[in-house]
Amino acid sequence: VPLLFALTAGGAFSVVYGLTSALRRRGPGKWASWGPAAAGIVAVLMVVVLGNLGGAAQIVSNAWNAVTSGASIPPFDFWASSRMMPGQIIITEFPFWTFLFADLHAHLIAIPFTLLAAGLSLNLVLTSGEARLNWRTAVLPLGALALTIGALWTINSWDYPTYLALGVVA
């Protein structure tokens, strides 16, 4: 599970860093030199740390109750954020919860591969207009994308159609 966490963080950083670097090169205006790195760090936080707003709501609610009634702040309920629909058993897990509790399911294992597929697709889009691109330099990225999307079929088939469409569009 720690390896999947690290691969997910690295994938999120890489995809967003690559995208913002490309926008910085192509777009008008001035971007700070640290802009792509900052965007990558924000992406890591958003993908692997931040989840739904249930945790934030719980903290605010418990703090408000402590301030207004003088009661002590109860311990944080990690499970509450994974079941957000009152009166129902709808599971609303998010990556941090899944990593925290080592809930090793296909949707967790697939996250680094979905980011890899997104990154490889982005690479194809960003390099498609380069003059030096020929069939030899395109075979490796296309092969890697095909292998990654094919692996998603085995890892978590629910992700396969989405990333197949993304790969075809790229």
Predicted regions and their residues:
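Start-transfer (signal-anchor) and selected internal transmembrane alpha helices
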Residues: 20, 26-45, 139-140
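Membrane-interface alpha helices of multi-pass inner-membrane proteins
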Residues: 98-101, 142-155
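Transmembrane-helix motifs of polytopic, lipid-linked glycan transferases
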Residues: 2-24, 114-120
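Short hydrophobic alpha-helices at membrane interfaces in multi-pass membrane enzymes
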Residues: 128-149
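Loop-to-helix entry region of an early transmembrane alpha helix in multi-pass inner-membrane enzymes
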Residues: 1-7, 100-113
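Hydrophobic transmembrane alpha-helices of multi-pass, membrane-embedded glycosylation machinery
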Residues: 164-170
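Aromatic-rich transmembrane-lumenal/periplasmic boundary elements in polytopic membrane proteins
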Residues: 34-100
